[in-house]
């Protein structure tokens, strides 16, 4: 089974690319690996507030909640396209876009990447 990485920021352009990724997955009998990346701010250790780790964790949680809220919307698009049977897995990764895409490609043994720009 072929694996297709679909990096997304959940924009309109990305949603359009998602439809194409679904159809490609259908044609090649593949599965989609949906990837959303985010980058947390870097703070100078000399000026790190005592509650920095709590702030960091709350930012991660906010990203996760936003990611989780978008998944049903993408599932609805798959159903509308008649492609609800395409397997979709989800990844949320912290880091810069290029590095996280490269890591996901290696970790997931990705065959194709489909993304909107």
What are these regions (language model features)?
Residues 117:
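Short secondary-structure boundary segments
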Residues 6, 34, 92-93, 114:
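A structural signal for the hydrophobic beta-strands that form the central parallel beta-sheet
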Residues 52-66:
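A short acidic, glycine-rich active-site loop
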Residues 62-81:
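N-terminal Rossmann-like dinucleotide/flavin-binding domain of flavoprotein oxidoreductases
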Residues 75-113:
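Structural beta-alpha unit
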Residues 2-54:
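Small/aliphatic-rich secondary-structure junction motif
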């Amino acid at each position: 089974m072929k694996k297709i990485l679909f990096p997304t920021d959940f924009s309109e352009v990305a949603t359009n690319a998602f439809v194409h990724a679904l159809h490609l997955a259908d044609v090649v009998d593949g599965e989609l690996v949906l990837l959303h990346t985010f980058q947390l701010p870097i703070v100078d250790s000399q000026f790190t507030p005592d509650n920095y780790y709590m702030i960091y964790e709350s930012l991660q949680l906010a990203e996760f909640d936003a990611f989780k809220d978008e998944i049903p919307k993408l599932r609805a698009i798959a159903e509308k396209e008649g492609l609800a049977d395409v397997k979709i897995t989800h990844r949320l990764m912290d880091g810069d876009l290029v590095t996280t895409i490269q890591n996901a490609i290696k970790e997931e043994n990705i065959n194709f990447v489909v993304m909107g720009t």
